[in-house]
Amino acid sequence: MNMLSIQADSWFDGDAIHHQPVTVVIDAATITAVHNGRIAVPGSDSLHVGFLSPGLVESHAHLFLDGHEFDTAKRQAYMEAGREAFLATGRKNLERLRASGITLVRDCGDKWGINHALRTEAAGTALPVVRSAGVAVRRKGRYGSFFAEEVVDATTAAACVRTRTDSDDVKIVMTGIIDFAAAAVKGGPQFSFDELSAMTAAAKELGKPTVAHCSGREGIDIAVRAGIGSIEHGFFLDAELLERMATGGTAWTPTWIPVAWVRDNPAACAVGADGVAGLGRILDQHRANLIEAHRRGTVILAGSDAGSLGVRHGDGLHDDLAAYADAGLPMASILASATSAPRRAWGLAGGRIAVGQPADLAAFAASPLTGLGQLRRAVATVVGGRLWQAQSASRLAAA
């Protein structure tokens, strides 16, 4: 790509929203200048947009799953479709993510290695960068069969973790699914504190962040004490746990939308009146915990569990962000949860618009302050210095 200058009417730098125009200059995949106002940059191609941000991040997705299929029987049959079908779905999902302004996606597990394969395919292209957790780890006979390998004790669990040399994160299935009517997690934690500590220590030896599928106070308490890097889902948190997470640096990916979709579409999951009532209580508590997490400084990573029933890739992240807004989180914090916070949590460069930062950007027609829905469709993205433009985007002009 030639040197590119992007002129934006307003912008988010990764921490704060700016209401004044800016010109961002990109050369050799790096931001080389940030100028106040709209200026012509000799020798560059130029693009004018309404709003510029670091590229959005989907912190929890399953790329091989088709979130656009709502029929549960068809979804079950799809699980037997095989590798080529899974790859084809994943490729479409990456394009959907890009169209939604997402330039980095963390795939949180599949047992067929589709996430690793897509990571390789997307590398060096204008598609979103794939961060892959590979195959997760679960207790034998417990929840997680479609994305996790079974282990039987602390020794085999730690040994399993040590094989994850090609994974970007190590995912551990700490608890099961939720009983909607009871508004509680089904069953106890899959691993004890000692077992989980052995696994997090093994991951630390590899230099890999850890991710735990975890809900319920008992499981989250163990996960936080054992040093898990981020809690995925995290239903039934409380103020004391959120404070410990804030103090210890444990992040939280709330994945609001899958549960909200079931509440709003109970017939699709054969959920009765008791279940709907339970879902309401669960989501009320989740909303309160979002507010409490923000107040205490717990790191929030925006992630939707895209691919789950009712959660479309791309749209899912924006639905989650809308839930944060409905809960009362400030716009700058909402944007940070989907830009700078994940990259910082994972030790990655980027997530900020500043000189010397990687050119990893998303451009939109207008500011989200005029409506968060403005972020649902990008007019352009830049990944590794490679520009992609939506069909409706302004044409490049020689400056």
What is each PLM-predicted segment?
Residues 205, 270, 284-367:
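His/Asp/Glu-enriched, well-ordered alpha-helical/loop segment
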